[in-house]
Amino acid sequence: MLKVLQQIPPENGHILHCYSAGSQFLDDFIQTGALISIAGNVTFKNNSSNVKEAATRVPASRLLVETDSPYLAPAPKRGRINTPNFIVYTYTEVARLRGIDVEDLAEQVRKNFSGLFSN
């Protein structure tokens, strides 16, 4: 996928949904104009180190947060059917990892999302 995006970059940007590829590819994807979307698996205690690292390394201007409903319900709701109501847990964890307020994260994500779809 990276090679295709590098050869034929989308004109209006694109989203990498539920990013989990790890930091070794992060900069390359960002250079293609991608917004990196972090899902509920960032809250998992096991098997989320790639996602946690990505959540801290994505430039603020390239970050999105998503539910991935009905899948990947965040802790403490893991194992349930995910709903948009659970997004607060994902935002809380991403904000904690980045050392910022949840409100500031939410405002940045709103700007990023609006910027992508206003073109």
Which positions does each model-derived feature cover?
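Mid-to-C-terminal alpha-helical segments outside catalytic/metal-binding sites
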Residues: N85-N119
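Residues at secondary-structure transition points
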Residues: S20, K45-S49, R78-N85, I100
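Catalytic pocket-lining loop regions of alpha/beta-barrel enzymes
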Residues: M1-L64
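Divalent metal-coordination and catalytic microenvironments
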Residues: H17, F29, D68, L105, ...
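Conserved short-loop catalytic and cofactor-binding motifs
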Residues: A39-V42, A75-R78, E93
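A general structural signal for short secondary-structure boundary/capping elements
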Residues: A60-D68, Q108-G115
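Ser/Thr-centric signal marking residues that sit
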Residues: T43, T67, T90
